[in-house]
Amino acid sequence: MLDIAQLETVYDTLAEAIDQAGPEKTELFLVKLALLQAQELGHAQQFAELTQRALKDL
């Protein structure tokens, strides 16, 4: 589990990468990132559950 400082680092890294991708490539970047993370996680059901958690309260 990440602590607050680590979460802030992850957030900053993600924000910088989204800026680098640019508005025309943001969706593609996020899909590629999600697929890479799913591969690292190695558990499709857990990925599906996390996806649903991320959709809550958008």
Where on the chain are the PLM-derived regions?
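N-terminal intrinsically disordered, cationic/polar leader segments
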Residues: 2-7, 11, 17-20, 24, ...
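An amphipathic alpha-helical micro-motif enriched in hydrophobic residues
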Residues: 27-40
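A short structural micro-motif
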Residues: 36, 54-58
